[in-house]
């Protein structure tokens, strides 16, 4: 079991702490590709810890949203299109999404 430091921006950090968001999503590269079920995520500034209870890889953000509880991935998005175009693509390009695919990490506070 490994521990990974994680930086999550607001409002998503608050959504996680309030249990409104149970999936953290990233491109499937670097440390996110290495993470495994039972590993620990630790918020960088607050030191709260979360256990990874599932990890799923999808071809793109839309497929991820179609297969997971939409409200538990991006609680403040109005639709899948809104989440993809106004949230995900602020962080990642469609080219990187296609190259690396997407990982959805289900977490539980410990």
Where are these regions (language model features)?
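Compositionally biased, charged N-terminal/linker segments
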Residues: 1-35
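Catalytic phosphate/metal-binding cores of nucleic-acid and nucleotide-processing enzymes, i.e., regions
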Residues: 14, 27, 31-32, 49-51, ...
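Short beta-strand-centered aromatic/proline hotspots
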Residues: 48-58
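Short, solvent-exposed secondary-structure boundary/capping segments
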Residues: 56-71
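Glycine- and charge-enriched low-complexity intrinsically disordered segments
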Residues: 70-110
């Amino acid at each position: 079991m490994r521990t990974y430091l994680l930086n999550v921006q607001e409002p998503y950090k608050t959504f996680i702490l309030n249990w409104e968001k149970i999936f953290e999503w990233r491109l499937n590269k670097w440390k996110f590709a290495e993470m495994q079920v039972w590993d620990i995520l630790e918020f960088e500034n607050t030191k709260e810890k979360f256990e990874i209870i599932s990890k799923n890889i999808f071809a793109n953000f839309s497929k991820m949203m179609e297969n997971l509880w939409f409200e538990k991935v991006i609680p403040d998005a109005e639709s899948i299109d809104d989440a993809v175009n106004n949230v995900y693509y602020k962080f990642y390009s469609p080219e990187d999404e296609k190259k690396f695919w997407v990982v959805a990490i289900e977490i539980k506070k410990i």
